[in-house]
Amino acid sequence: MADYYPLIARAIAGLDPNAPGESRRALYERARAALIAQLRSVQPPLSESEITRERLSLEEAVRKVEAEAAQRAREA
């Protein structure tokens, strides 16, 4: 299982700090779509459970990045 946290955290760090939450949500949606497309193109094909496991790993990385962003906002 891949560790998506560094990729997501780096992508978010590249956004304007004053950008609205919608910018982060759009980035997450692009990451989700790219991941699913990439996983579905793997040969031999991955099982649905393998795809779900990777998707959930990405979602955990998103939750972690969002929790860190919320913590920074509270401290500001």
Positions of predicted regions on the chain:
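A membrane-associated low-complexity tether/scaffold signal
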Residues: 2-17, 21, 28-37, 41-76
